[in-house]
Curated annotation (Swiss-Prot):
InterPro entries reported for this sequence: Aa-tRNA-synt_II (IPR004364), aa-tRNA-synth_II (IPR006195), aa-tRNA-synth_II/BPL/LPL (IPR045864), Asp-tRNA-ligase_1 (IPR004524), Asp-tRNA-ligase_1_N (IPR047089), Asp/Asn-tRNA-synth_IIb (IPR002312), AspRS_core (IPR047090), GAD-like_sf (IPR004115)
Similarity comment text for this entry: Belongs to the class-II aminoacyl-tRNA synthetase family. Type 1 subfamily.
Site, Important for tRNA non-discrimination: residue positions: 30, 80
Oligomer and partners: Homodimer.
Protein name per the record: Aspartate--tRNA(Asp/Asn) ligase
Gene that encodes the chain: aspS
Enzyme class: ligase
HAMAP family the record matches: Asp_tRNA_synth_type1
Keyword list, A-Z: Aminoacyl-tRNA synthetase, ATP-binding, Cytoplasm, Ligase, Nucleotide-binding, Protein biosynthesis
Role of this protein: Aspartyl-tRNA synthetase with relaxed tRNA specificity since it is able to aspartylate not only its cognate tRNA(Asp) but also tRNA(Asn). Reaction proceeds in two steps: L-aspartate is first activated by ATP to form Asp-AMP and then transferred to the acceptor end of tRNA(Asp/Asn).
SUPFAM superfamilies: Class II aaRS and biotin synthetases (SSF55681), GAD domain-like (SSF55261), Nucleic acid-binding proteins (SSF50249)
One Gene Ontology molecular-function label: ATP binding
Amino acid sequence: MRSHFCTEVSEKDIDKIVKVAGWCNTYRDHGGVVFIDLRDKSGLVQLVCDPSSKAYEKALEVRSEFVLVAKGKARLRGPGLENPKLKTGKIEIVLEELVIENKSATPPIEIGNKNVNEDLRLKYRYLDLRSLNAYEIFKLRSEVALIARNTLAQKGFLEIETPILSKTTPEGARDYLVPSRVHEGEFFALPQSPQLFKQLLMVGGMDRYFQIARCFRDEDLRADRQPEFTQIDAEMSFCDENDVMGVVEDLLREIFKAIGHTIPTPFKRMPYKEAMENYGSDKPDLRFELPLVEVGDCFMDSSNSIFSNIAKDSKNKRIKALNVKGADATFSRSVLKELEEFVHQFGAQGLAYLQIKEYEIKGPLVKFLSEKGLKNILERTNAQVGDIVFFGAGDKKIVLDYMGRLRLKVAEMLDLIDKNAWNFLWVVNFPMFEKTENGYHAAHHPFTMPKNIECEDIEEIEAYAYDVVLNGVELGGGSIRIHKEEMQKKVFERINIHEDEAQKKFGFLLEALKFGAPPHGGFAIGFDRLIMLMTQSNSIRDVIAFPKTQKASCLLTNAPSPISEEQLRELHIRLRKLSLKDMI
């Protein structure tokens, strides 16, 4: 049907007959001469038709998004008529034949216009996908998937599919449940990850497994979350942390070659505690400096009892300083107020600061600090004339969080972030357990190998867990797994999953660990998130062909939707409205 894609027509085709196909991107009638910009997956080429052509009458019928097949002679555009913005900007095709394969209603969205309301774009996603930018995104997505497959296959990994209909197990988020028609009152769960099955593959001697896996989590959505998502998932036997990290680094190095970027390996490694204390995040963005500095001891003799009491509880409290170089010249009083309001939404009671002037130091904290304390703060933060030093004080977890967010906010305001940089980092030595309102739970998942399970202070137990971070975004992570039944039971006990419950939920895993499970570990990389970063897209929805909204609905198909009474009966389900009493 065609001899060339639109942008394949070049100067070497001058005076030759070519045949192209695609959609009418724009239509113009200039004094009887018709110009059509034809668009296909490769880009645009200009068609031109004057009244002498036998295709002229047909060309007059063309409108936006009509599907066309065009045949004509390629020629150079006239002097001054070239379009340097187009790959085909020096040439045009003089129409000899034109077939309208299909007409189009007036499109409800302008193809390629990112300023169109996102809900409207998602409702007409098939039109939104016609944009050249969308094609480039999904072309890269396809290339990256192929690179991942080839790279892992060359390293001896087997691509093996794991079940989609599985057993509900607690992994941190709610499961999507599927009622069984055959087993009345029982449910399958869609997998949040292939975690347990890939471990069982290692028990089964598969040695190295991978898949590009579909996963499902019924959780509150954010810009980088979807209820169904894809991850590059892998597991390997007889390995340690270094082996797994090496595979991930090799994989990402090959993937980033696809966009012409050579990333240095090995990646820098940073312990979790260092990341939290110095950057206020377990996924620090290291494209810029601005570290947090601990200054609690500088307030030990403060005349302000609030600060001095915080300083004396170094286990549970923190006083952190953030020196913003040169900020005194650019941060007005209104900006300082804006920053205070910003951190307030994350639990800060206020935002104290010192302004380093040429002949004095100003700020509400000055009068509460001893001369020695002030001197130590200035030295430790390397504060100089023109700087502003911000302070966060209070509960350790809250202070680290809002000061880390302040660090990012200030970096964005001062344009300190190199948008063209790719900064990879391993965060290691995560805590094994985290405290919640209902006790402790596994920070990653309960199948991660702990480093010091016998430690009396549960919060000091670390895990053989590791996250790979790119530009302040968690790209993926993994861990060395527990491969002995006794250790798995100890971990369950630490998070109050007692023997009966453990057997009910994970009996199949505990049984498998009795039969010579090898040491093993693995990783998962968020595939959608990776493509979002590589294409510098604003939302993960831009890199998924048919994404859900932030309310977990599909505007294109109107899913989820009610089902018929007959379907409910087949599934042995009856719906009823809950009363207030039922919900209490």
